[in-house]
Amino acid sequence: MMADNSNQPREYDAVLGGHSQIPIAGAVLGGIAGVKQRFNSPSIEARIAAVKDAPKYGGAGLNLAIEALLDPAAEVQRVAYLILRSRTEPLVRQALKDFVPYKLFDCIRTVKTGTNVAISPGGDRTASLHGKIIRICDVDTGEILYTLEKYPRAQETFVLCQESEVFVRSRNTPKHRAIEIWHEGELRHTSLGHEGEITAIVISPDSQVIASGSADTTIKIWNLETGKLMCTFGSLLTWGAHKAGIVSLAFSPIAQTLASSSSDGTIKLWNLRSRECSQTIKGYANCLAMSPDGQTLATGGWDRNIQLRQLSNPDSSITLAGHFNSINAIAFSPDGLTVVSASADGNIKFWNASTGENFYTLSGHQSSVTCLTFSSDGETIISGSIDKTVKTWGVN
């Protein structure tokens, strides 16, 4: 049976009675008392060492690690967060729920890719164009999972499904405007119907339907499983439809509402059950996102600003200003408390969704950031850029 050495001196243990050497009459504080003494030190290194030791001392140690999340030094916060995030104790989970880790984010992985990058909603896979080939790759390793050929002289837009196995792309040629649904590299369905260039595609969070928007001013809803057209929102069929080409689309989390923006200067909300336009908001938007509770709409534009609107009162909005170029993509954190934006200025910004405060900025891409998403657990974000890289950002 090993002796309990928890009270024996360790590196950074506080010594009473001296500074440079342990005096004969000095006393060394060990155990949790020593950890607390080191944690109260002005030395960042001493506080980090204390936090690393803290979990050895049960509940008292965990309380100290939780307290370290509020330390003024980001280095100490980072160590505490990395120690605590895998713990399951209710007290720890609550503390992490109240903690915002994004201000500790750095680039933890960079993978070379192609152009026209798309990222799956969970951040597991990417699709990108490499010359005449579209590659679908694993985000973590960069491994090529399968490839597809690009159509000659065709303009293409593509998206990946939540489950990642499904790949959807638009094919715009002078003769054809088609939606193609692929499963692990095998073409399942080709859906025709748009008369103009297909400019936007989005898959519902429940992976049941696809929405496509076109320069022909219409929005079409397709069944993802069968490829069949379910309905069309257009000026000839629907009251309140857009009068110009569609720019961007976004589903609500439970896929009951679709948001659309158009070059006609309006943003519209569509009720997918009644198949009616439920709201029209004046404004231009290059990209859209809806909060996890479906109550807030975020819009980003060429004016470099982001607008947050409560759908219960869409005429009132919070403006998020700080980017130096147009906004290309927006996402909400899984808890809905943080908005993250990607811009043509090459930066990624984090915003408090309630106050509009920009509390952190990530720089690392060498060119315009075109897409981003949160990982399913919210612990990382994945971004794609014109610089032909996909970056994963998290606490390292």
Residue ranges and their predicted role:
Residues 139-142, 182-186, 224-227, 272-275, ...:
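Short loop/turn segments that connect beta-strands within beta-propeller blades
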Residues 1-111:
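Extended repeat-based scaffolds of very large eukaryotic assembly and lipid-transport proteins
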Residues 126, 166-167, 210, 258, ...:
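Hydrophobic beta-strand positions that form the internal "hydrophobic ladder"
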Residues 370-396:
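Blade-level signature of beta-propeller repeat domains, shared across WD40, Kelch, NHL, RCC1
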Residues 117, 157-158, 201, 249, ...:
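Hydrophobic core register within WD40 beta-propeller blades
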Residues 108-114, 149-155, 192-198, 233-246, ...:
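WD40/WD-repeat beta-propeller blade N-cap
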Residues 121-122, 162-163, 205-206, 253-254, ...:
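Residue-level detector of Asp-centered blade-edge/turn motifs that repeat once per structural unit
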